[in-house]
Amino acid sequence: MNLLLKNCHIIDKDKDIYSDILIENGKIKSIGTISEQCDQVIDVNKKIVMPGFIDLHTHFRYPGQENKEDLYTGSISALAGGYTTCNLMGNTKPVVDNNEIYNEILDKSNEINLINIYQCMATTKDLKSIEMINFEKADRKIKFFSEDGRGITDSLLAFNIFTEIEKINKGIMVHAEDHNLTKISTRYAEDLETIRDCYLSLKTGCRVHFCHVSTIDSLEAIKFYKEKNAPITCEVTPHHIYMKDSDFRVNPSIRTQEDIDCIIKMIKNNTVDAIATDHAPHTKDDKDKGACGMIGLETAFNIAYKVLHEENDISLNKISELMSYNPAKILGENKGVINPTYDADLVIIDIDKEIKVGKFNSKSNNSPFIGEKFRGSIEMTIVNGKVKFEKGAKNDNR
């Protein structure tokens, strides 16, 4: 099975060219002026073609909270936002703290067969931050462990977790929050645990990825320890670069313009590695009761384009690096650029078309961006060489 994309405006971390793309058996075979006969030919008509976006931080709520989202609706929501790969957090019900639940999620995702799914496993049993799981027995397919949704406040426990994860050559995704300080200051809570975990990464050699970094001091700490060659990476969310001084409940909290300015600076100097959505679906009742989080897969690119490119003159090449290449590198996958032999995970974007945020493919609609207008319409998403989503087609429920 082969697919030819004609008249593409190709943009990845290095390229900004007009060319054709030949896809064969799920891989990019060649780039150039291509005239050979193919099973399927799509004229892109000079729209932008980028590597599919990779979300390092997603909640699909399966198992246990399928009233908010499930693997199918989450995957369609991802495709509608140009995402071809999602890395799921383990704070489900029951918690992903054993191989049985871990493989159940992967098996079901493979049956649905829409996007590439990776799944994190918890670091402690039932996410209670008391008893470590048996890391030696954890499935070797696991890329990262995570206690996402809460920090590991006990420093001795954190040290032991980092040490055990380093032994098996895996990584940890850290939700930096010292819960002893949260009621005093969510800023202090994030900063203190970020500084501690940077130090532990340096001393243990454990690969640490910091989730949803939102403050000046946390970013400065990450920069400082990166310069000491600690094996750390970090992500920021679209809502933390777009919203300021808002009471919309997310964790970590929405910060100030000064924090946003620092995030932009740290994107430009390469301290920030990735943009990740922290897509967190909730029902209206849960939000009314104070649940933290928002959906983000279907608006992430638009916000990144507006804030980074239109307002701060950051190139689409850099946005591709943040949303595709670096996340692929962090996961250790052959994705994220448009080169021969790489996975044919692609998104086609009409960058001149305006969209108005309204209906979502997600089961939930807990978004503060409803009614806002952005440039950039996701027209088609291709996963492993197959068209999995087309705007307005039968699986687009907006």
Question: Locations of the language-model features?
Answer:
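N-terminal metal-binding scaffold of metallo-dependent hydrolase/deaminase domains
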Residues: 1-36
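His/Asp/Glu-enriched, well-ordered alpha-helical/loop segment
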Residues: 188-205, 268-275, 279-351
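C-terminal cap of metal-dependent C-N hydrolases
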Residues: 8, 343-395
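Divalent metal-coordination and catalytic microenvironments
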Residues: 8, 26, 46, 57, ...
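Histidine/acidic residue-rich metal-binding segments in metalloenzymes
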Residues: 130-275
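A glycine-rich helix N-cap at a beta->alpha junction
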Residues: 107-122
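Active-site metal-binding motif and surrounding structural segment of the metallo-beta-lactamase
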Residues: 34-50
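Metal-associated gating/positioning segment near the N- to mid-region
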Residues: 47-109
